[in-house]
Structures are given as structure tokens and as C-alpha cells.
Amino acid sequence: MRTCTALVAALTLGLAGCSGTPWSSDDKGTAKVSCGLVVDGSGSGTSDDTGVDVKKKLQETLLPFLDERHCSSLAYAPVTASSWNSSCRHSPVDLDPEPRTSTDDREVLRQRARNSAAGASIEMLNCARKQNGSDVLGALGRIAQTLRETQGDTGGDLAVLAVSDFEQADPEFRLSREPLATKAERTRAVDKLLAGRKLPALKGMDLYTVGYGKNPTRKPSTYEGFDQFWTDILTTRAKAHVHHDDE
């Protein structure tokens, strides 16, 4: 219980001082959004020295994201060696629960739900770290499918927060080994990755990234090819609306 309390407190601190995030908006509307979270459990996601400190980034960005995007629910997907088939699972959290009695305080219920969602994000991260690997594409596909299924006939907007450096590295494909300098090379690499795999059903979704391209082992001269590789997949082919944390 003490650990859980400390965790929630740490995550709540992320609400302060996070202006300028890619999802920041002056829109004060009340439209609700079904949201998803992709959590990278690969070895590069353990600290800022080896890549992206995913736990730290979650503490800094998750609650502001939920608040500023008016998320009504939060679903989860892990980045592991085989993200589609990973046993790391958590049911979507209802962030706007209906009061059961006339004396229930709706704002208190919402805060409890947000705290539960924050705690579940760390549970997902801890599980993913035990499976290692970095199938980012599979995680995006899994979260997109989950959101489509849970959305049902209610319509509404869909948004995904992906905390990952996007260094695809699974048993069948390692992005770091692919030449990406020319358009032809990038197209071959994209086709190679997508061979036998589903393109994430992200069409029309807002995809917000934290840690994108931040792996310190990647040479600065290779970033443009890396970025164009993912732009081809996410924007051109999947037709997502992508927002990176440095924009």
C-alpha cells in the first residue's frame, strides 16, 4: 500500500510544470476522447543514459495527457519482443465513472480513476520489462485495435500516447541494421517490416509520442532516415495524425 501511494504521488507531480507538451491545447471543450497508452519495456527504456527513461516520462506526461485531451477512458499496450502476443494486459480504465449513489462526489471518483490508470501504467511497464524486445509496430497495432473495439458505436475521437524511442527491434527485424539514407532504401525497409504484419489501424487517430528518436546510440546523421521511415508507416500509410514531443 505504501508503495502504491508513493507511486500515485510521484505520478501526480507530473501535473505541474508540463506546459508545451505536444497535446497542450487551449480548447476548454468537454468532448470526451477514448485514449490509449503504449509503454516501451525494452532495454533502451530503462534510463536516459540508455535511451528513454519510460517510468520518468510516464510520471511527467501521463496525467497531463489525460487531462488536456479530455480522456474518458485509457487502454494499454506494451512494447515487448512480440507486442501483439504479449501476456502483459490490463483492462481499459473508465476515467469518467458514473456515481452509484446521490452522495458520490463525481470529481472524487474521477481522481480515483486517474490514480488507478497511473498505477496500471507502471504495472504494464514492469510486466513489459520482463519480456524485453521492442516490437513498436505491434504495440501500435494492438492499441489501435483495442481502441476500435472498445469505441463501439459511440463514435468520438481517439488518441494514443506512445512512450518509446521507436527503435523497432524484434526477432525478425532490427531497424538499426537497415540502411535508410535514400527513399528507395527506406521503402524496402518499410516493406520488409510490414511483410506478413498488419498495418496499425491508426487512421484518423491522434498519435502523441514521447521519446521518439531519443536513443543515444543512434547517430545524428541517421535521424532523418529514421524519421522518414516512421513517417511513411504512420502518416503516409496508416494515416495517423502524429505529434512528436519536440514539436
Predicted regions and their residues:
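N-terminal export and membrane-targeting signals
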Residues: 1-10
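P/S/T/G-enriched low-complexity
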Residues: 210-247
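Von Willebrand factor
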Residues: 30-100, 102-156, 159-160
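Solvent-exposed loop/turn segments at secondary-structure junctions
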Residues: 41-44, 81-84, 166-170, 213-216
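VWA/integrin I-like adhesion module and closely mimicked acidic/polar interface patches used
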Residues: 167-222
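Bacterial signal peptide processing site
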Residues: 18-22
